[in-house]
């Protein structure tokens, strides 16, 4: 049970038919709406380590919409792969630091292995160095947006206020980013 990934592969390879599949709840879905935005959130039960079934349920429950944004955890783990599977565009968010660049390279390799289109957003773009930009240039990866560090963004989030509502200039940055995503056919990003 603890090692199960929910893929059914063990049943396929067990010639004796000794393995059976059963339903084990791993989490739940919460649905919500704010003005024109519908939200589906998957919550993993405490003590459960396997989130891909919850992610699949979120994707299945997501409304048919012109734009579907799936926010994944960072990294290249199974939950990330399940989150990006089938995406029209994978938007990788990074920071221009050595750690950020290392993680970006791993994520780019994963997305390329899945043969999915990708682009990059550089967060806190005014810190660090230019190596992230150089990597993207050398790999022909579009940088759709660079967002400089702004303490007011963190302060707004700490109050539960989205940056785009607290700061009009952030709203313009995100609106411009959305236009770029949509122009690339990113209906399922």
Question: Which role does the model predict for each range below?
Answer:
Residues 1, 5, 9-25:
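Iron-sulfur cluster-binding cysteine motifs and their immediate structural context
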Residues 41-46, 50, 57-80:
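Switch II (G3) loop of P-loop NTPases
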Residues 110-189:
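C-terminal lobe/tail of nucleotide-utilizing enzymes
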Residues 5, 46-53, 102, 165, ...:
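Conserved active-site and cofactor/substrate-binding residues in soluble primary-metabolism enzymes
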């Amino acid at each position: 049970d603890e090692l199960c990934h929910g893929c059914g592969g063990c049943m396929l390879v067990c010639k004796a038919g000794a393995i059976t599949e059963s339903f084990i709840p791993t989490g739940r879905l919460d649905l919500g709406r704010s003005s024109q935005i519908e939200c589906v959130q998957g919550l993993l039960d405490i003590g459960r380590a396997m989130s891909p079934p919850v992610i699949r349920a979120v994707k299945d429950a997501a409304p048919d919409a012109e734009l579907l944004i799936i926010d994944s955890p960072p990294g290249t783990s199974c939950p990330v792969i399940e989150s990006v599977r089938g995406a029209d565009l994978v938007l990788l968010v990074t920071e221009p630091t050595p750690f950020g660049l290392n993680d970006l390279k791993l994520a780019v390799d994963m997305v390329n292995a899945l043969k999915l289109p990708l682009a990059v957003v550089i967060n806190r773009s005014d810190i660090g160095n230019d190596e992230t930009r150089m990597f993207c240039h050398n790999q022909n990866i579009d940088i759709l947006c660079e967002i400089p560090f702004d303490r007011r963004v963190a302060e707004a989030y700490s109050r539960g206020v989205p940056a785009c509502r607290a700061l009009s200039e952030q709203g313009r940055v995100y609106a411009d980013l959305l236009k770029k995503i949509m122009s690339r056919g990113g209906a399922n990003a």
